Amino acid sequence: MTLGSETKTDVEVPIINGKHEIPQEENDSGHSSINTPDSSEPDKQVDKFVKITIQPSCGDAFELHLSDNELVQELYQTLLDREATCHRTCFSLYLNGTAVDNYSEVRAIPGFVDGCTLNVVDEPYTIRDARLHLRQVRELLKFGLTEDQHEPPCTNDAQSYLTTINLQPEEKKEPKPSDILPPDHALPGCKERSLAHLLVPQPKELIALKDIAFSPYNPPPGPRKLRGDVLYIDITTVENRIYHVTCCTRGFYVNNSQDGRFDPTVSNSNKTVYQSVIELLQNVSPGFKKVYPQILKRRQEKTLVERLPTSYPVSSWVGNPLKTDGYMSDSLRAIELTEPFRVGFEDHMPGLLRDWNEELQTTFEMTRKSISERVIRDRSYYKIHADYVNAAARGVQSILDGNILAINPGEDKKTHMYIWNNIFFSLGFDVRDHYKELGGDAAAFAATSTDLQGVRAFATLDDPKLNTLGMAIFDYRGYRVTAQSIIPGILEREQEQSVVYGSIDFGKTVVSDEKYHELLEDAAHKLKMLPHTVISEKDGVKEELKLYTSYEAKGIIGNDGRKYVLDLLRSMPPDVHYLDDAEVSEAAKTLGYPRKFPHKLSALRRELIDAFCESRLVTFIQLTAKKIRDLITESKEKNDETLIKQAAEAETELSLLFMAISEDKEFEAKNKVVQDAIKEACAVVHSIYEDRYVMKFNPDCFSSNVKHAPTENLERQRRVVVDAADFLLTQKIPELVQNLKDCVVQPIDGDNLADIMHINGINIRYLGEIGKRLENSVSFARPLVLSDIVARSAKHVIRKINVQITADQLSASTSHILNCLFSVVLDPSPIAANVAKKANKKNGKKRVTSAWSSLTTSALWNSIREDSASYYGYPIEADSLEKFTELHDIQKTALFRRICKVMGVQLVARDYQLDNSTAKKTSIFVEDDIINFFPIIKHHEPFTADAKKMFIRGQQAMSIGASREAYECIGESLNLMTLVYGVMHPDMPQCLRALARLSHVLGETGDALNNQHKAAVMSERLIGLDAGNTIIEYINLAHFAFGALLIPGSLRPLYRARYLMNLVFGEKHPVMAQIDANIGLILFTVQEFDTALKYLQSADAITKTIGEPRKLKTGLISNLIARTHAARGDFRAALVAEKETFAIYSELYGPNHPRVNESSEYLRTLTQQAVTFQKKMLKLDNSTNITELFQAQPPTVTSLFDTLNIINGILIIGVPGLSSLGKQQNGTTEESKTTDVAAQLDNETLD
């Protein structure tokens, strides 16, 4: 198969980003029958797969299989990916002698048919083409270099550790002990927490070229332009020879220029004009000719998942230290990264700047009636949004580096606003006292997050007539910067002239517009916002106006005629628990609510509102149905025909009511009995209206700034909001806490915990409430929750310090702050104080000493305690971090990692010995440890709803055991994601993981391993090398590698996962117990009994320590420990372990279960073996065969693999492919039959 074919295949097969797991979609997101066809595809166009031939301008022709709906531009990318053509960039595609349009679909090309031939024709160079060509040359040569320390810490070039692990064994080679036995840092009980193992090992550098630069003789003078000169380049080869090269319209050639003398004519020694710089270098530099093929080989060894850039910027909190001797010069990089006016698209886009708002709105409004139209629309919108976020990230870093001038430079720095690359940037401070009554800067900071939540909510409505702004939030170096697209004409008008809906003076004056009413009515209904009437007063005249949203939301009609809605910070109802003057439930009062909070913009999450409304609807249906059932029962008991008739009529009308509710339609009951039942149920569930069920929220009902009309029943409206907040406090939080105690959910780090809280509709500010309910438990989640409270409180404190720090003090201040946290700093920083003192004396001016320089350990810890109490409502009693971590068994390295990640700090990966008592009195961190800062990015993340629906259908199929149907649904979901997102996206790892598990239970081991490998690589690159989701992917990968009998390949990911768990959390976690059980079982399989016993005992000890309920897997681990002891000859210990197994099975299943009987039988066998062993030991002589002393039969590999399936949460019947290994080890013949299997992919379902 040709390389081009491989490229297209790699894109189309299921390839595997978990900020994040795919959450369950809203009500209309696929909760239909699994086999229900999609009836909304009247004009679905069937895509065809065709075979074409491409004839490059260099090299042989090759065939390519592709879908006819692909863009011609993708064929260009295919040519740039091929080894033979990747170095040629200036060309066009021709069909039958006619140039092909780049941006058209393949099937739209005139004359295009299956089997046709496209010819590649080299085009004349322009300066734009020349610059793009040099960029491609630089990208190709980068594959031979190690990590580039010049790149910003927030880039699209993430690395993967898994690519350095060889899962496949070398042929005809037995695995060495070093391939099987664990490294020291992966042993149970290891105290080493070095970050050095976290980094990806770098291969040997392949340097093909020293430098390539634009010549100082540029641009070509007029006479030379007229002869075709485009650009002049200076190239320094590895032989230290400098070649002066002319780029002309025909290509590149060596010219006669020398140092100090300009002569761009063709060199007498080399008169050839080459189509690319690569071809030129291969002819003039022997070193380049030797190394370049090795670079290409290294590039081709990487799959698309490993080498393609990520859609959104990613960053790492650790990196290699700066090495001056390895700091290579790169003139092209120097130009690109030191010119702040460059936006990164000049060479690609026509015109000067991109109109982000126009691109975002145009793609958002594209038709979406059929699946093919939705795929094209989603792909276009996602691509432009990703480009927008990347551009905004670059702009934010340039702004805080001081490289971009504010549009209001004369005002205070906190009020500065910026426009760069058609993006509007503002800082998260309270300018002009806009949020003075709501909390000042704290409210301004929070308003951006709640506004983004509103944008996300409105974006899910898919109403093309209602537009929102492109928006992204960046937390960088202590600042919060908001990036927004610009509404056409907004900068040319006053705000009063622009706003046609909402209020610009905090609710005193409100304007409304019928056009917006029509658009907002449906949006408000879907978002459960209650339309309400307010009183607007202007010039002494009062007027009643209807609002469908909060008064804070503003409607603006842009010059492009589009209707925009912005300032959506009050799209969700307020959280009354954090409003001082609000009424709360009695249960909330007993818990200390309402309580003071830094701001008054706290809002409930949309997930909570959906769950609350669903709960109240269920209660309403149950109450009304009970009323009618009681009537039916009464009529039957009395045998009264009149009552029987009334009951039948009521039952019929109630059925119509329930049908109307399910279809989200209004229904007016006419039956008196049904009316009474509805009124009684509405009174219980606190419906907005007395006579019909309506559960909607007035976002302004607790606002003191706006006046409601007398017709509004504020008491009922407020009651519903209070009930929703009470539902959060009395049901959702206790439910989550119990799930954490029972290990039903197992978050690994703070990011996982935040995701789980958000999925359950719980805001992060309730961390303290969860912490209070866990602080006296032995749950694994206790140290995780409490350490996250400390980390987030530290972030709040340090943020206030960082905004006062100048750029030249960032390294010193950050290292000093970290020393104050993790070592003992009794006195202010002497270095900073001396520097400030000398500067003040020299300048003769009064200068305030930096806030960080006077910071000590006790002062910083007290500030953290104060923030924890005020923000999270969690009082920290410990008077130092040291005592706090000891009291709650928190690992310092895990806390250190979390603080660095939430601060956005990148440090040198080394062993900081935070748990070393001797290091506490000295400075652990120095300035050289601080590498850089990176922005933490939040943005609206577009998604493909069709793919999510198919994934949910696949999950439903899995839940009923329809494995093949589930595989098809999830595979289709992954194909849709690939069409929309490309090769990588955060939602893809979950799909690939599910496909891998389904392949595994269906007996397709190779597919399972392939899919899971892609999932793990994608998780590493998109979520993080040490992310919680990445650890889970490693465990699954090891499972499937063991299924393929790749023993070293299964152990290496597990050792990596154990090291990461030790770093990210510590040992006392159920996932660590799972990892140790996996390692112990695999080592037991290869008869490394001593090492296996360490891991199995560790797994058992962890399970008991964290109070995990006894389950099937607990008994299996005890049984494995018993068998390992027996294999080592320690029958007494084996009996003790097996007795525990018997007790667990008896407790779980009762006395007559097969597992109980099996354990009882094994106990008898062990007892007999122990007696026999003792007798033989007493008669031991020189003629005794040692192997005869051990009569216990080890379990088959098939049974061990069944055990591994249960430990990892997979129930599988029949394991094909393992019988051969079982025969080799046990000398037995077992039939392995492939049976129809049902997959239960949830740990708790198994137990």
UniProtKB/Swiss-Prot annotation:
Gene Ontology BP annotations: intracellular distribution of mitochondria; mitochondrion organization
Protein name: Clustered mitochondria protein homolog
GO cellular component: cytoplasm
The organism's place on the tree of life at top rank: Eukaryota
Primary location recorded for the protein, binned into one broad class: cytoplasm
Pfam family, one: GSKIP_dom
Keyword Cytoplasm: yes
InterPro entries xrefs: CLU-central, CLU_dom, CLU_N, CLU_prot, GSKIP_dom, GSKIP_dom_sf, TPR-like_helical_dom_sf
